[in-house]
Amino acid sequence: MKRFNIVLIILLSLTLSGLLFLRWKAREEPAVPVIAETAPPAPVPTAAPTPVPAPVFTPTPPPTPAPTLFTPPQGYTEESYNLVRDMVYAYADRQDDATEIIRDDLEQLNALDPALGVLWGKIMPLWSEVNRGLVIHDSILPDGLPEDESLCIVVLGFQLHPDGSMAEELRGRCETALRCAEKYPKALIAATGGGTAWQNPNATEAGVMAAWLTEHGVDASRILIEAESRTTADNAVFTSALLRERHPEVKSLAIVTSDYHMPLGVLLFQEEALLAEYETGTLPFSVVSNAALDTGGRVSPDTPMMQRSYLWSIADPKY
């Protein structure tokens, strides 16, 4: 019995020691968490895809043309305007080689509008004449011009120096005009040219020329000043308007400018007179002569293409 009790005590001691050891071990090594396997999600049933219809391509209609803003000059239809334009551009591009084109266009224009046919039947030969057969008088007007107030000597301006003083070429034109004014003492003198001195806005070519002429003995009452123009076409349009308004007695014009510039000057002043005749029924005046400053053979910048621009700007105010 005594032995049995001893054995029991030993067993209990061993059991208690084992439990204490396990508890101590649990504190040293934390338990590894057990991760339960997650079941995959159940598949979500999807509806069958809706079929997409094939795209239908509708052809794009052509754009609606913009309304035309074309308005021919007064007295012209679109057809007559195009005939005149064709003649002007043909001569500028080809000169004498355009003769057949000009003849055909004039025939059509005469059938379409006889008055316009007559007008351009005068302008187109004039253009050819000033480039091929114009007689240019050196330094002074010839004899035989009107000796009364019906003659006007038109002096074309030239670019001023920035300060408003005369360039040498403009002085030469004034000297030519002075000789002509002394030869024809009853003639009116029209000085034409606007402000071209960028450092002196008060100076104009016409004003400077008029001052020079009066300083050299020309009576100021003989001088008509046109001081608004910027181009030779402006010279022709503005001076002609002043002459018709203030000096209807003038019937003959004599142009004074540089030799190389004379064909353009004669062409534009005579064209303006012919256009006035077309509009009013009366020819106000004609270019009858000229006197040129000799520039020593300076080559003219007034090519037929340049002439076309000026001539067309007078014939078509929208140009």
Protein language model features and the residues they cover:
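A structural signal for short, hydrophobic/glycine-enriched beta-strand patches
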Residues: 23-26, 33, 65-314
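N-terminal Sec-pathway targeting helices
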Residues: 1-13
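Hydrophobic alpha-helical membrane-insertion segments, chiefly the h-region
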Residues: 12-23
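The feature marks non-catalytic terminal segments
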Residues: 318-319
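Extended hydrophobic/Leu-rich segments
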Residues: 7-9, 19, 35, 57, ...
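Ser/Thr-rich, Proline-interspersed low-complexity disordered segments
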Residues: 27-68
